[in-house]
Amino acid sequence: SREIPSTDGKQPQKQATADLVKIDIVNPSGGEKEPVFQTVGQQLISEDVFRVLTPAAPDSIKAMIARGDAMQPTISDGDLIWVDVSIKTPTSDGLYLFALKGEVFVKRLRLDNFNHSAAIISDNPLYPPIGISKPDKLSTLGKVISVTKIYR
């Protein structure tokens, strides 16, 4: 809450305000040795809304703008993707941010624990899956926790 000064000589009034969480909006790119997250802006959201998304610390969450059509219809070009960058080891199927061959991208991961393998899958059927024989060697940069659809 914050105090609003009185203009009539009375006591200042308290006004309830939502606590805000600041999330970096980043542009991920494949670096020579490690991917780079260049901060291009910030998004303010209420702490209450943030806690609905995740119990993670705010500095573990990065937002980024989706590019391309490989994950349509789940993620469209221009959507805002929220990623928990503290999750580096996938333990379940889901959407993850990966680095592979100098590229950074979001894909669906399907783990096959029985065969100790995995598949990186685009939701758009025009893009074939990528088989991974050693999923523990994947360069996982984080797990997608939410997608904000941007309608244009």
Predicted regions and their residues:
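Short, positionally conserved secondary-structure boundary motifs
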Residues: 1-77, 149-152
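Acidic/glycine-rich C-terminal interaction modules and beta/coil loop segments
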Residues: 32, 51-152
